[in-house]
Amino acid sequence: MVRYYDPETTSEEDVRPRERTRSPAQRQALMRERNAALEGKAAFDAAKEVALRQLDVRARSQHELESTMTSRGFSSETAREVIKRLAELGLVDDLAFARAFARGRFEAGGKTGSALKMDLSRKGLSSQIIAQVLSEIDADEEYSRAHALAEKKMRSLTVHDRQVIRRRLFSMLARKGYAPQVCIRVIDELLESEDCDEL
């Protein structure tokens, strides 16, 4: 915005150059300094506010919350205290988070097995929780999801060479974490049903 001054009514002292606004990096550095300077209850309350705002957006793992609070300048001790308190209140539960996250990834993207395990470990979840959540996925449900994904992919393929189709379907299912025996079974059934349709 341009500011116009009347030279007859405005003195030079009144005309100051506009202060430069801080860049996002400068604002973040200033915020980290302020948060690091906080102590005791003030630090706990400010860190808790950060965690609650994060939880307002979506459920988070304890690791994600701790990373967010420490990246904002709070000590890891303060972050752990806040997480402990939120866990006591039932607002943070890694097992419930892992179940919901895995269910969402499985239903929306069809991920399972090693691909889902990798996604869960990125969230900072323990190997025990990951193993428990992965064991809860039903084999029949996994097979039907793999079948649906492969069927959808097969419709989009324009090639007619069976080996190319087999390779592309197998690699797509393997990237999503399906076991080789599931991939082979699904692909064989799809190719067999396609052969029957052509007769």
Task: Show the residue positions of the predicted features.
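An alpha-helical, amphipathic repeat domain used for nucleic-acid recognition
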Residues: 1-199
